[in-house]
């Protein structure tokens, strides 16, 4: 009788669990449908916003507490977010973190450990891309794993630098070099920190340890006075979120593949690509602004003080919104968008390739790494190839205008400044959209179809300028200017 009752009770509990899970799935799915989003996208947004209650709990109950409690809290909350989004597939991140800890401990501060880390973590990520690849953008475990991959590679390099003589390191390397030996709990807390696990930003182990040890504060002995700065970034993120949610059903990359798009005049196709190219980036802007607010709230965003003594909270800023919205150059967009990832690539890839003795080659290899890091689709390679080409041409054009007396005088005419700005912004966002077309459509058959519809305008325009500008420079820059430059 007792065993029968216990069995019935177990069945009821199991059934209740299944029903609860089913209702949760149903309600989330229904809500996502009503919002015009996928369930995975809704889970992602919920998880990002969960960082705020987690940060408030940390501020009120764990700040200045024992460090192991803080590491446990970060690990538990990060794992919970991973499970909520990806279920049992959280084992991918857990496995890579544990193996990374073993690499550091068993191989020590050696170049072998760095190379092993780079090869293993990148191979695991690329294998994940290969086995989960589809023709569309899907939110799956590889999304946070690409963030984790950079964290763990950076951890290995900083640990390696920590064993070198201080004098042999640059000031930047000294700042990030890890002198101590991280424990497994510290590595887990660093990796799973809820404010950055899903979509970034990137930050170093040293910066994370300063947070845990209560050093990232603007007033000694008190909780960071960061609520207002955090709310400002949250509000800005919500503004972009609302705008993106309202407009996303009307401005889609799928429309680029339709016959209706092909049947419109050439100018319309270009203008749609321009508007879509700007708009499509707003989903990334939204996520990064919201997560930056979480980082600021915890104190991780603390970045010292300004000259006037005002605290700076931009250590985890992934966006410079004003620069992003107003700068008419491609290099301005690069400097204002995904800042921490770009800084990571500059610190751990570009500057480490200095031995090649060729800045363009180092930049090209860095962009190749970024393309592979994003995924195996051909569209990523095309996008970053276009970025490389555009930046080179933009620098050539800027140098020509600066060194040519005629063009310098024309550029300085005040009344023409608004016209110049409009032309620059039009070129800027048209070809940003052109590059993003390959990035967002992934597969060669899709982006090739769209590029054909606008006659490969971006490639023809910038490749032509790449070869023509040196001759224009030769014709328009006086010889004395060239000699002065050589001196």
Curated annotation (Swiss-Prot):
Membrane topology field: Multi-pass membrane protein
Report the superkingdom from the record.
Eukaryota
List GO terms (cellular component aspect): endoplasmic reticulum membrane; membrane
Q: State which Enzyme Commission number(s) the record gives.
A: 2.3.1.-, 2.3.1.23, 2.3.1.n7, 2.3.1.n6
Q: Which positions does the record annotate as the modified residue N-acetylalanine?
A: 2
EC category: transferase
Q: Per its record, what are the GO molecular function terms?
A: 1-acylglycerol-3-phosphate O-acyltransferase activity; 1-acylglycerophosphocholine O-acyltransferase activity; 1-acylglycerophosphoethanolamine O-acyltransferase activity; 1-acylglycerophosphoserine O-acyltransferase activity; 2-acylglycerol-3-phosphate O-acyltransferase activity; lysophospholipid acyltransferase activity
- Annotated localization: Endoplasmic reticulum membrane
Question: Where does tissue-level expression of this protein occur?
Answer: Highly expressed in liver, pancreas and adipose tissue. Very low expression in skeletal muscle and heart. Detected in neutrophils.
Q: Which GO terms describe its biological process?
A: chylomicron assembly; endoplasmic reticulum membrane organization; intestinal stem cell homeostasis; lipid modification; negative regulation of inflammatory response; negative regulation of response to endoplasmic reticulum stress; phosphatidylcholine acyl-chain remodeling; phosphatidylcholine biosynthetic process
What keyword terms does UniProt attach to this protein? Acetylation, Acyltransferase, Endoplasmic reticulum, Lipid biosynthesis, Lipid metabolism, Membrane, Phospholipid biosynthesis, Phospholipid metabolism, Transferase, Transmembrane, Transmembrane helix
Q: Where are the membrane-spanning stretches?
A: 44-64, 84-104, 111-131, 180-200, 227-247, 285-305, 364-384, 422-442, 453-473
Chief location bin:
endoplasmic reticulum
Motif Di-lysine motif extends across: 484-487
- Record text on activity regulation: Activity is inhibited by thimerosal.
Its pathway, per UniProt, is: Lipid metabolism; phospholipid metabolism
The reactions it catalyses are: a 1-acyl-sn-glycero-3-phosphocholine + an acyl-CoA = a 1,2-diacyl-sn-glycero-3-phosphocholine + CoA; a 1-acyl-sn-glycero-3-phosphoethanolamine + an acyl-CoA = a 1,2-diacyl-sn-glycero-3-phosphoethanolamine + CoA; a 1-acyl-sn-glycero-3-phospho-L-serine + an acyl-CoA = a 1,2-diacyl-sn-glycero-3-phospho-L-serine + CoA; (9Z,12Z)-octadecadienoyl-CoA + a 1-acyl-sn-glycero-3-phosphocholine = 1-acyl-2-(9Z,12Z)-octadecadienoyl-sn-glycero-3-phosphocholine + CoA
Q: What is known of its domains?
A: The di-lysine motif confers endoplasmic reticulum localization.
| Family to which the UniProt record says this protein belongs | Belongs to the membrane-bound acyltransferase family.
Tell me the function of this protein.
Answer: Lysophospholipid O-acyltransferase (LPLAT) that catalyzes the reacylation step of the phospholipid remodeling process also known as the Lands cycle. Catalyzes transfer of the fatty acyl chain from fatty acyl-CoA to 1-acyl lysophospholipid to form various classes of phospholipids. Converts 1-acyl lysophosphatidylcholine (LPC) into phosphatidylcholine (PC) (LPCAT activity), 1-acyl lysophosphatidylserine (LPS) into phosphatidylserine (PS) (LPSAT activity) and 1-acyl lysophosphatidylethanolamine (LPE) into phosphatidylethanolamine (PE) (LPEAT activity).
What is the protein name for this chain? Answer: Lysophospholipid acyltransferase 5
The source organism is Homo sapiens
């Amino acid at each position: 009788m007792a065993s029968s009752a216990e069995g019935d009770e177990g069945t009821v509990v199991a059934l209740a669990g299944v029903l609860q899970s089913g209702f949760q799935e149903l309600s989330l799915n229904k809500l996502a449908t009503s919002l015009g989003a996928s369930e995975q996208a809704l889970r992602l947004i919920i998880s990002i916003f969960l960082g705020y209650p987690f940060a408030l709990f940390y501020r009120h109950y764990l700040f200045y507490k024992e460090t192991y409690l803080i590491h446990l809290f970060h690990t538990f909350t990060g794992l919970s977010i991973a499970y909520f989004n990806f279920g049992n597939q959280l084992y991918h991140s857990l496995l890579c973190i544990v193996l990374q800890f073993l690499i550091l401990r068993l191989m020590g501060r050696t170049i072998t450990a760095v190379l092993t880390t780079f090869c293993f973590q990148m191979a695991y990520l690329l294998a994940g891309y290969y086995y989960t690849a589809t023709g569309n953008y899907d939110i799956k475990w590889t999304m946070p794993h690409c963030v984790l991959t950079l964290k763990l590679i950076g951890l290995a390099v900083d640990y390696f630098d920590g064993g070198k003589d201080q004098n042999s390191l640059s000031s930047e390397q000294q700042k990030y070099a890890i002198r101590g030996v991280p424990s497994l709990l510290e590595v887990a807390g660093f990796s799973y920190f809820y404010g950055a696990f899903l979509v970034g930003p990137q930050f170093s182990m040293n910066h994370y340890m300063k947070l845990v040890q209560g050093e990232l504060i603007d007033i000694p002995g008190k909780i960071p006075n960061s609520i207002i700065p955090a709310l400002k970034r949250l509000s800005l993120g919500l503004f972009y979120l609302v705008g993106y949610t309202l407009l996303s059903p009307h401005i889609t990359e799928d429309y680029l593949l339709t016959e209706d798009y092909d049947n419109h005049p050439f100018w319309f196709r270009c203008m749609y690509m321009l508007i879509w190219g700007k708009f499509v980036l707003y989903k990334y802007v939204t996520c990064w602004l919201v997560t930056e607010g979480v980082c600021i709230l915890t104190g991780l965003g603390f970045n010292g003080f300004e000259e006037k003594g005002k605290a700076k909270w931009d250590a985890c800023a992934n966006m410079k919104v004003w620069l992003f919205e107003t700068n008419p150059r491609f290099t301005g967009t690069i400097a204002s968008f995904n800042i921490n990832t770009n800084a990571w690539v500059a610190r751990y890839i570009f500057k480490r390739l200095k031995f090649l003795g060729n800045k363009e080659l180092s930049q090209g290899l860095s962009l190749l790494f970024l393309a592979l890091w994003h995924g195996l689709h051909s569209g990523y390679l095309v996008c970053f190839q276009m970025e490389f080409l555009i930046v080179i041409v933009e620098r050539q054009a800027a140098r020509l205008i600066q060194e040519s007396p005629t063009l310098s005088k024309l550029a300085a005419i005040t009344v023409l400044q608004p016209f110049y700005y409009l032309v620059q912004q039009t070129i800027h966002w048209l070809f940003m959209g052109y590059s993003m077309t390959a990035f967002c459509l992934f597969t060669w058959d899709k982006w090739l179809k769209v590029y054909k519809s606008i006659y490969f305008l971006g490639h023809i325009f910038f490749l032509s300028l790449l070869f023509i500008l040196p001759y224009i420079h030769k014709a328009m820059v006086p010889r004395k200017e060239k000699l002065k430059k050589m001196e």
